[in-house]
Amino acid sequence: FVSREDCVVTQYLAGGKKTLPELILSIDPLETLPKFGVKKWGTGPEVNMKYELVYDEAGTYLGQAAHYPVFVESELQDKGYVTMVRILHTGGSRNVEQTEGSKKIHIRGAQAVWILAKTAAQVEMGEMEDFPGVKAQETIDAVLADLKSAVAKYRTKEGSWDYERALALQKEQQRETYGTVSFHLGEQTADSGEEGVEKETNTELLQRQKNTPQMLQKLMEQIYQTGRYVQAACAGYSAPRLCGLWTGEWNPGWSGAYTMDANV
């Protein structure tokens, strides 16, 4: 989940009674992403951006600092961003292995792994020829400090990390936004083919719809609620954001045209 409380992306992997499979964490060089620098009309400006991959020798974090490409009429001249990822685990071992173009963090035999990530924009990254420079390092340090605070806030006496407590604080804030609107199309009855649907999962509702000639009101409600949740989750409290779908490509086919406006 993305925490409104702490402004970090939080992931939790647990092996239960068994240890987790080997986990490999790395950031691929941007130019290895499909369609990097490839656009319908020719070469994309991203081929002229600069970036550096950031790691520590102990494998506690990894990240990327980048300077946006410079071109005529760019709104991102002398700007950039930093994304850092903090890695925690209980049990097992961790080591860093050098690979061509990057490093990989290997975690073996862990009982649980927590991955915290944060991205920050830098509107004064400086001249392209000076990158990475002072501003990039200052932004890296600031993001790592925020991640360190999030780690300390939920660290338990046993040395693990309290994911449930972090999630509870996020739910509390998200519930306030999500609960401002309700949507109900009426009572479900046997005549409408919807008797007993209140406790059905989305998967069960979709299966029921396949066997029901008329549109299920409950399914329409669930589609609306799911879409509203996504929009609320990506909007924050400030100006609306656009929520795009990540396809693993640098220049996806929709090229930014099909996004969800959180201000709908």
Where are these regions (language model features)?
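Aromatic-residue-lined binding/catalytic grooves and analogous aromatic/hydrophobic interfacial grooves
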Residues: F1-V264
